[in-house]
Amino acid sequence: MHSLGQVRVKYYKRNVGWTMKSRYRFFCLTLTFVLVLCTAGQVSGSTGTDEKKAVSSIVQMIPAAVDMKETDGPGNLYALSAVLMDGDSGRVLYEKEGYTARPNASTTKVMTCILALEKGSGDDYVMVSENAASQPEVKLNLKEGEQYYLEDLLYSLMLKSHNDTAVAIAEHIGGSVEGFAKMMNAKAKEIGCTNTHFVTPNGLDSADAGGIHQTTARDLALIMSYAVKNKAFLHITQTRDYSFSDITGKRQFSVHNANAFLDMTPDAISGKTGFTGNAGYCYVAACENEERKFIISLLGCGWPNNKTYKWKDAMKLLEYGKANFHKETYWQEPEIPAIPVKDGTDESSGKESGKENKENPGKILTETGTGFADVYINGQIQASDSDKKKQILLKEGEKITCHLRIEKNLTAPVKKGQKIGQVTFSLGELVLDNYFVTADRNIVKITYLWCANKVFHDFFH
């Protein structure tokens, strides 16, 4: 058995994906070649109409470079809902109706894939049911009773968006489509989605007692942000062409990646398209540029015959993000004051009344009327080294604020690790992180029994 993402040796050939840069170079060379052919046709007297139309349709998909610096947004978008998200922090950098729930078609399959990767194994045998085989186009044309490796079906799912494949995977992982939908919705909540309801694993327009199948551009971006952290998911969605067979080897298949955005920019690292009558054209993508990760989410981005709208919108959002956001570490070490503790003593320090312990200077500061010194404790922020290295995409002029809330005084007893405050990092009204401040040691309460024991100990020792 092997985990998904590992390469399994079989008798047939697999063509794994090109690198992002090589795909981009190939696209540019192909475009140049077609342009040369068009020019040659004109020179020789041939109209070259078909070639001109082909080139025109490709060029129109790629918007002209514009200066997006210091703009309020990417300009007009075709999509009804759109989000540009910081793929690392989850912060929404731009949104247009980003929190409005809409049908999301085959972008649903991002969730289907990630659940299969987490719950299944690449060598799992997946049996095709009558229900799976009867799914509508687009489909691989699976037949009832056939068996496939789960890994192979994931390439069919993500490269060509086959609906029958999605149902076969769902029934294998969740026992049924309904059982898998429950898993999908639970995972969505775990990721942080707030207005998502899944009914099917393939995204076909559907509804159940919980409502219609839908999500928001913001939730979809969160799901993609989560998915691209999985190396196997990235490997699958970056693969250009893939070949496989059923378990018996009798039926052979080849699938080609339908995510054309991979060829339009070297920044694209993953993506999934979708279309239904209710959803329109949808798209979700992940892009990386200079260690910045951008997630692009588009819902209702045109209806036939406007398949190219999603590419234009995606490129606009990407260019806007690249021009306006830089990466910055936002940790700030706050100065935490010592906190006085009433009616307590720090036995671990060996302090005597009114005297300062040389090993812990500054802990006993004043005499009280009781003959005992006030005890001061320090706070410790519960943040790891990785927490202190967190980064976020910021626009010019944006500032992260660090706010410390701490108890002004405490009353004994105090236990080590007891919460005594909180540090909050914010960007405007958006709270990025909260970290507890805890007591650095135990403080014992001074009682009559403690006094008696103290007198007895001092007298006999």
Predicted region positions:
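Structural motif marking the loop-to-transmembrane transition
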Residues: 23-24, 100, 150, 448, ...
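Domain-terminus/edge residues, biased toward the C-terminal soluble/receptor-binding domains
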Residues: 211-461
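Active-site-adjacent loops and short helices of periplasmic peptidoglycan-processing enzymes
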Residues: 6, 43-231
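Short, hydrophobic/aliphatic alpha-helical segments
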Residues: 39, 155, 259-263
